[in-house]
């Protein structure tokens, strides 16, 4: 089984352009299942072949995870990893049939995306001290994240060449290497101009390697800023402005979509700006805005009270 899993991970990296984090997640979930199947079948894990695992064993696996008290989302994710793996095995003609076609995934509760209100988003992105180089960088970073509705992985990958500051556009490389052009508002452009002119050269001077680094956002050592580094920066300013709930970089992306729809943007345009392949991925934000409007109605309309 290990050979097939290794080949599948290569397929994800090379053909599906999956990120290292994604392939690592798949590997972890597949190995978790493999440990259970080895125990269930009374075999060494390296001796298991795909045909050893039928739909009954997959159902036992689900029951086992349920007994462990795992969240439905965790169970569904692990099963989804095995679904993808077995679809790959079937396409490669390694198995004759897919046993997971007979296994239902756990039903998940639909959770609405968390977002910031407009005044909260404004307070957060304006929190950095722009008198300092790192503050200039942080302001530009937060403005770009919010103004462009970027995923954290997209922000990390931005290079200087992706930014057309004069036109106010940024080229974003999304999932599966799909590119899109995203407009930036005047505030994001101003923050980026200040960062590029005054702060980035000083951060670049700190580079130990003394090599040209094309990354748009740099850390204090003049290296490309990592996803972990961006999360730390966001956490710092969330604490500074005392937002009393959990905020992630994706919260700013959710806020971007919600605020556009609240202001009357059409769904197709928001879909394109966010880089969603399916409209259904964008439609979830209409539920968010719908819930907000419902609360306003119930609070304000005389016939809704009581």
Curated annotation (Swiss-Prot):
It holds the Pfam family Phage_integrase. It is found in: Cytoplasm. SUPFAM superfamilies: DNA breaking-rejoining enzymes, lambda integrase-like, N-terminal domain. Its main location: cytoplasm. Gene3D superfamilies: 1.10.150.130, Intergrase catalytic core. It comes from the Bacteria. The active site is at residues 151, 175, 250, 253, 276, 285. The keyword Cell cycle applies. GO terms for cellular component: cytoplasm. Residues 111-298 form the Tyr recombinase domain. GO terms for molecular function: DNA binding; tyrosine-based site-specific recombinase activity. Keywords: Cell cycle, Cell division, Chromosome partition, Cytoplasm, DNA integration, DNA recombination, DNA-binding. One of its GO terms (biological process) is cell division. Residues 1-90 form the Core-binding (CB) domain. PROSITE patterns: CB, TYR_RECOMBINASE. Forms a cyclic heterotetrameric complex composed of two molecules of XerC and two molecules of XerD. Belongs to the 'phage' integrase family. XerC subfamily. Site-specific tyrosine recombinase, which acts by catalyzing the cutting and rejoining of the recombining DNA molecules. The XerC-XerD complex is essential to convert dimers of the bacterial chromosome into monomers to permit their segregation at cell division. It also contributes to the segregational stability of plasmids. PANTHER family: PHAGE INTEGRASE-RELATED, TYROSINE RECOMBINASE XERC. This is Tyrosine recombinase XerC. It comes from Pelotomaculum thermopropionicum (strain DSM 13744 / JCM 10971 / SI).
């Amino acid at each position: 089984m290990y050979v097939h899993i290794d080949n599948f991970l290569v397929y994800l990296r090379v053909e599906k352009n999956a990120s290292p984090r994604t392939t690592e997640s798949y590997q972890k979930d597949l190995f978790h299942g493999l440990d259970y199947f080895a125990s269930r079948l009374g075999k060494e894990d390296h001796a298991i072949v795909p045909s050893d695992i039928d739909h009954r064993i997959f159902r036992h696996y689900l029951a086992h995870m349920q007994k462990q008290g795992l969240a439905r989302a965790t169970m569904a994710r692990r099963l989804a990893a095995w679904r993808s793996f077995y679809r790959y095995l079937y396409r490669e003609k390694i198995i004759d049939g897919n046993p997971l076609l007979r296994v239902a995934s756990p039903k998940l509760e639909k959770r609405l995306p968390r977002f910031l209100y407009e005044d909260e988003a404004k307070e957060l992105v304006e929190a950095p001290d722009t008198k300092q180089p790192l503050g200039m960088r942080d302001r530009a970073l937060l403005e770009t994240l919010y103004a462009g509705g970027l995923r954290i992985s997209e922000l990390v990958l931005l290079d200087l060449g992706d930014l057309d500051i004069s036109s106010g556009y940024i080229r974003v490389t999304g999932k599966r290497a799909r590119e899109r052009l995203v407009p930036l508002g005047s505030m994001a452009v101003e923050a980026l101009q200040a960062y590029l002119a005054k702060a980035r050269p000083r951060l670049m001077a700190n580079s130990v390697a003394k090599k040209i680094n094309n990354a748009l956002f740099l850390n204090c050592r003049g290296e490309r800023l990592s996803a972990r580094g961006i999360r730390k920066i966001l956490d710092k300013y969330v604490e500074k402005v005392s937002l009393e709930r959990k905020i992630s970089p994706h919260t700013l992306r959710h806020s971007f979509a919600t605020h556009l729809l609240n202001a009357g943007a059409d769904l197709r345009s928001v879909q394109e700006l966010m880089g969603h392949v399916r409209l259904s991925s964008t439609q979830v934000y209409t539920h968010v805005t719908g819930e907000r409007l419902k609360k306003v109605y119930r609070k304000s309309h005389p016939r809704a009270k009581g």
